[in-house]
Amino acid sequence: MELETLATIWFVLWTLLWAVYFVLDGFDLGLGVLLPFLGKSEEERRFIYNAAGPFWDGNEVWLISAGGVTFAAFPKAYAVMFSALYAPLLLLLFALIFRAVSFEFRNKVESASWRALWDGVHFVSNLAPCLLLGVAFANLFMGIPVDAQGVYHGSLLGLLNLYGLAGGLFFLSIFMMHGAIWLVIKTKGDLQTRALATAGLLWPVVLVLLLVFLVLTFFCTDIYANYWRMPYLVVLPLLALAGLAGVPTMLNAGKPWLAWGSSALFIVCVTFFGVMGMFPGMIISSLDPAATVTAFNGASSPMTLKIMLGVALVMVPIVLLYQFWMYRLFSHPLTARDLDDHAY
């Protein structure tokens, strides 16, 4: 296969890895943000922790995979991206570290104040990635000030522009809704009722922020140009809207798993909508279009991409099957018996 074909395949796979990460770790992050609002008692807070408990660390594998693929398949894009977005990515790393610590440390001491401290850490360390990921991807869609040498000529505050902030709030609302639906699946009783109501309240928020983000995308980016050049891509926003519409429909029908699947479809299609709108661009330069790093000029050698593709065709299905088995194993709603000494 030629370099252009291989680079295109890996661009799609790279997008898919990010989409899968957003779907799987998105509900974990959303649960953490919802913790102080839905966890009214110690038992309810433990239910929220344990709704994410068996999954959260395995879900982060997809983030590592996305970063690893960026490094191996698109080394030039990796170098520029991690240099330009160094500050938000470092903040993201620290947030994920503290999130892991909050899971493990919370129940190590029998003290209400100790648990309250780590509940606060847990909330912040889940809120931050939601916002940071949205801000980072919105700025990638819009373009960042990098020159032909890959040197970033901006600042962290420069990333907090109107479009970046809209992206952060949009991601936050999606993950919160996604997490609320997961809590409907994993709980019973009063907590489930409040989670269901919360998902219903968040749905119109997601819709409004989606419309705002789409309007700002028209004025701030060139994403829609790809949809004029490649009309078949219109299936992505159509499927995204179908997924979003399916959330309240399935919740009202008492089918939370299908509602969560609809939310997952929405997340996947929104991710592909934005990233495929950049194609073949990966790091769009707002200073000089010639300095833009694309999937073609930033890719590894054809031999490297072929070897990686062979490995991916073997390993990715294995990981997917394992995670499917794990989700199936822990698909039952939580009960008080699940909150034993070994639970969170």
Regions found by a protein language model. Name each.
Residues 105-259, 273:
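Long, contiguous internal "core" modules enriched in hydrophobic/ aromatic residues
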Residues 285-307:
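Short, membrane-exposed interhelical loops at transmembrane-helix boundaries
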Residues 268-290:
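Juxtamembrane non-transmembrane "cap" segments at the membrane-aqueous interface
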Residues 31-54, 72-75, 104-115, 179-198, ...:
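Juxtamembrane membrane-water interface segments of multi-pass membrane proteins
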Residues 159-174, 301-319:
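Hydrophobic alpha-helical transmembrane segments
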Residues 1-58, 64-67:
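N-terminal signal-anchor module of multipass membrane proteins
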